[in-house]
Regions:
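Bacterial N-terminal signal peptides
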Residues: 10-21
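Structural cue for short, hydrophobic secondary-structure segments
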Residues: 69-72, 95
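Bacterial N-terminal signal peptides that target proteins for export
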Residues: 2-12
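Serine-hydrolase catalytic-loop signature spanning alpha/beta hydrolases and amidase-signature enzymes
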Residues: 74-82, 93
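A short, Lys/Arg-enriched amphipathic alpha-helix followed by its capping loop at the start of a domain
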Residues: 82-91, 126
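Flexible "cap/lid" subdomain of the alpha/beta-hydrolase fold that forms the substrate-access gate
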Residues: 28-48, 53-56, 61-66, 94, ...
């Protein structure tokens, strides 16, 4: 699903304003220093934590109330690199790589949103953070929603960016939308791994707008998914969508903010459903 930097900047600016108002088996990941840290202008560190039977990589900086940033597909934590220095002026910012993606370790299973929300929750506890704000884009929005469902006492609020929620709103329409064909494709057993392997940059470029993402950006994201185990992990997230549908049934009282394009009917209907089913939720719409 396409995402535009200016769109994200504007939405996170809205999020900051809203937050201010409220305030007033696995294998070990490859250890590396991410050169992308240099783009953040200092004050950020890259680290990892053993949580929920896996190892999560994250980038942290700033001080103040905590904002957890959860990326979508086909990105990793770097998706938020432009806004992280801005948020760090007022918040503790933690951008995490989802289980099996980028610098995080892959596992045999556990890729449903509820379990990955537990990953994030244990990371929050590991970092001794309290009452966090969660921002999730795309599949990260599904994790953020599950986090709010499971841990209302830990989350002050959740913001979902262009995130359809399995089982909520017009999910059947989302799955049958030809412009979102990759959902069904990536749920297919085994075949996507064989077709995408070695062609990661070509495949990911399809989802990343050429006016926004340079070839260098695409190459970076391709590296985050290039290892066979990381590609498989990304696909397993999609294969876990049926489990997410079963989880996303009950009404919750945790405030949730949804943001999406006026052009994207499925997202608009999803957010309308969220407004009805989640007490305290609100929806922001951007002008295209």
């Amino acid at each position: 699903m396409r995402m535009y930097d200016r769109w994200i900047l504007k939405l996170l600016a809205v999020f900051v304003v809203a937050a201010c108002a409220v305030i007033q088996g696995q294998s070990a990941p490859r250890q590396r220093i991410d050169p992308a840290l240099a783009t953040l202008g200092g004050g950020f560190v890259s680290d990892s934590a053993q949580v929920n039977g896996t190892t999560l990589h994250y980038v942290r900086g700033g001080t103040g109330s905590a904002v957890i940033l959860v990326h979508g597909f086909p990105e990793d934590w770097y998706e938020y690199h432009r806004v992280m220095p801005l948020l760090a002026k007022q918040f503790t910012v933690v951008a995490v790589d989802l289980r099996g993606i980028g610098g995080s370790a892959e596992t045999a299973g556990g890729y449903d949103a509820a379990n990955m929300a537990e990953d994030v929750h244990q990371l929050v506890e590991h970092l001794h953070l309290e009452h966090v704000y969660l921002v999730g884009h795309d599949i990260g929005g599904m994790v953020a929603y599950a986090f709010a469902r499971r841990y209302p006492e830990t989350s002050r609020g959740v913001m979902m960016l262009d995130a359809p929620v399995p089982g909520i709103g017009p999910w059947d329409a989302v799955k049958s939308n030809p412009f979102i064909w990759h959902i069904n494709f990536q749920q297919t057993p085994d075949l996507p791994e064989q077709l995408i392997a070695g062609r990661e940059a070509i495949y990911l470029r399809h989802f990343l707008d050429r006016d926004t993402f340079s070839d260098a950006d695409v190459a970076r994201y391709a590296r985050a998914y290039a290892a066979p185990e990381h590609l498989r992990a990304a696909l397993e997230i999609y294969r876990a969508f049926p489990a997410n549908e079963k989880f996303n049934a009950a009404e919750r009282d945790q405030p949730v903010s949804g943001a999406g394009s006026r052009r994207k009917l499925a997202f608009r209907e999803t957010h309308a459903k969220l407004r009805r089913s989640v007490t305290g939720s609100r929806v922001c719409k951007r002008q295209d």
